[in-house]
């Protein structure tokens, strides 16, 4: 009906690919699956075959700056990259063009986010957006990235020092809950 050989059907709100299906002419959904999607709402996304061969890149941004990236790959015979379904991930270095694409996606979201994850797939035509995760994404944090996230959170929640306009110095532990 949409001119797609395969499509991904997802609930409008979900986590960890719960309730996500790969649709093709020979695959159908049970009546209970259709009822569930009708209740929660859903969306259809063109299936990008590169997910099976190259995986999906997650670009993590903390306090408006690119932090790190991971490549998520599905288990053999599956299309979902989440570990709950056998997917695996590894830290990677991404090309500047891919990082620039992620930054452009965040700029289009027109807000300063404390954290964000931009999921993309690299195709012969360039990177394409799969999802923009802003609510509660898995961030694949390293210790240094966790510190940047904590610093960003503190700078947004602590009152600025009246004289300097800067957040309080936390290096001495002063002002931190013990």
Outline where the language-model segments fall.
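Tryptophan-centered motif/residue detector
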Residues: 4, 61-62, 115, 140
């Amino acid at each position: 009906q949409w001119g797609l050989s395969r499509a991904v059907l997802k609930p409008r709100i979900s986590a960890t690919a719960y309730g996500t299906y790969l649709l093709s002419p020979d695959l159908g959904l049970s009546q209970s699956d259709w009822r569930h999607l009708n209740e929660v709402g859903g969306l259809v996304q063109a299936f990008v075959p590169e997910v099976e061969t190259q995986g999906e890149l997650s670009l993590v941004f903390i306090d408006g700056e690119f932090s790190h990236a991971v490549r998520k790959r599905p288990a053999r015979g599956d299309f979902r990259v989440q570990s709950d379904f056998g997917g695996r991930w590894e830290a990677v270095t991404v090309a500047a063009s891919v990082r620039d694409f992620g930054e452009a996606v965040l700029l289009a979201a027109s807000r300063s986010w404390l954290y964000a994850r931009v999921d993309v797939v690299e195709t012969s035509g360039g990177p394409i957006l799969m999802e923009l995760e802003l609510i509660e994404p898995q961030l694949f944090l390293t210790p240094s990235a966790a510190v940047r996230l904590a610093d960003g959170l503190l700078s947004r929640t602590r009152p600025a020092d009246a004289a300097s306009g800067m957040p309080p110095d936390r290096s001495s532990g002063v002002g931190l809950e013990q």
